[in-house]
């Protein structure tokens, strides 16, 4: 682990320490990984509500005449599918079709798009966009201008309503409001598969919002949750994590994110390579694996059919919901592996039998 002094620190670190958090490095940031324990936090989010500080996530602003048109010519998804007050999952690709990052784009208006990339990739996304931006369009890195607080779970709407924050909105919509004189962007987004929200207050005012949310979450039977639970929750949903299921060497098609590509658009980064891959078919595809017996799967393990290696796990964990080991894996398409088929995974020399499944592993409840 990196020395704490070398890591970036969020605006709420003292509060997390007061709550008894344990910390770990993620994307160059020192972040709370757990409080009461990952399983407890996971189950609280699935059954009640969890409060996550994900302020390490990046923030960037594209502004100027035709900003939306420019972003639409750079990122994969089609911004014309949405409009002001809506958000969209999209990808920033390289010219070979690999993924620089996956991110959320918030459509403010035709001349302003707000972006939330991953922590470690913010500078790369900003650099890619700055290099392509036309005259009159600026791309600014606002990484430490805003915090991001996620309220996730079946009681999340009750928590926001209790505080007078907007909660009755469609999935992937957002609203700008204020809370105790602090401006807040409230978004119907998340990374858990549950009904939830992500709130963006100014970095320096995040404590006001966090304290109120923490009290309301506790009153609703929930608890603060760290990045450990965030990872088990997203893995159960089959959501990709950059550096695992997506990377400069892993395309959106291989990760089953082709739905986030506007194929009819005339331009976006990596378009020619991705069209060629779509025509030929990806050489590997993301699949889910569920252990038949006991054990835990991790990333980087070899997947075999018989004695033949056919892929590698990209993420793995113990699913608190299923009480079973699960994993995501990139499997070679020429191996003709089918859902329901049994394969083995080499876990430190032990052959672990797994069933191939199509994620999500548990029901989606985002809407």
From Swiss-Prot:
Keywords: Aminotransferase, Transferase. One of its GO terms (cellular component) is glycine cleavage complex. Coiled coil: none annotated. The keyword Flavoprotein does not apply. It catalyses: N(6)-[(R)-S(8)-aminomethyldihydrolipoyl]-L-lysyl-[protein] + (6S)-5,6,7,8-tetrahydrofolate = N(6)-[(R)-dihydrolipoyl]-L-lysyl-[protein] + (6R)-5,10-methylene-5,6,7,8-tetrahydrofolate + NH4(+). It comes from the Bacteria. GO terms for biological process: glycine decarboxylation via glycine cleavage system. Its EC number is 2.1.2.10. GO terms for molecular function: aminomethyltransferase activity; transaminase activity. The glycine cleavage system catalyzes the degradation of glycine. The glycine cleavage system is composed of four proteins: P, T, L and H. Belongs to the GcvT family. This is Aminomethyltransferase. The gene is gcvT.
């Amino acid at each position: 682990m990196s020395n704490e002094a070398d890591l970036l620190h969020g605006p709420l670190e003292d509060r997390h320490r007061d709550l008894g958090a344990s910390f770990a490095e993620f994307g160059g940031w020192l972040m709370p990984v757990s409080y009461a324990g990952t399983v407890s936090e996971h189950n609280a989010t699935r059954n009640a509500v969890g409060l996550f500080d994900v302020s390490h996530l990046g923030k960037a602003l594209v502004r100027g005449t035709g900003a939306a048109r420019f972003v639409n010519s750079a990122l994969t998804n089609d911004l014309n599918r949405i409009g002001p007050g809506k958000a969209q999952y999209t990808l920033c690709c390289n010219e070979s079709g690999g993924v620089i990052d996956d991110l959320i784009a918030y459509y403010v208006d035709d001349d302003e798009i707000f972006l939330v990339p991953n922590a470690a990739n913010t500078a790369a996304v900003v650099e890619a966009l700055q290099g392509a931006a036309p005259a009159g369009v600026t791309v600014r890195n606002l990484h430490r201008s805003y915090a991001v607080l996620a309220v996730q779970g079946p009681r999340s709407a009750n928590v926001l309503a209790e505080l007078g924050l907007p909660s009755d909105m469609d999935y992937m919509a957002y609203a700008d409001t204020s809370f105790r004189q602090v401006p807040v962007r409230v978004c119907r987004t998340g990374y858990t598969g549950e009904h939830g929200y992500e709130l963006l207050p100014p970095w320096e005012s995040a404590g006001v919002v966090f304290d109120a949310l923490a009290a309301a979450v506790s009153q609703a039977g929930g608890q603060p949750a760290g990045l450990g639970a965030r990872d088990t929750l997203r893995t159960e949903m089959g959501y990709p994590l950059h550096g695992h299921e997506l990377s400069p060497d892993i395309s959106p098609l291989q990760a089953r994110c082709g739905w986030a590509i506007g194929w009819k658009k005339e331009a976006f980064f990596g378009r020619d390579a991705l069209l060629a891959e779509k025509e030929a078919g990806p050489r590997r595809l993301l699949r889910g694996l569920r252990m038949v017996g006991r054990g835990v799967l991790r990333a980087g393990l070899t997947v075999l059919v018989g004695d033949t290696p056919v892929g590698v796990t990209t993420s793995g964990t113990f699913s608190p919901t299923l009480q079973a080991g699960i994993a995501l894996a990139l499997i070679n398409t020429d191996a003709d592996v089918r859902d329901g088929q049994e394969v083995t995974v080499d876990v430190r020399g032990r052959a672990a039998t797994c069933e191939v499944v199509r994620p999500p592993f548990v029901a989606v409840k985002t809407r």
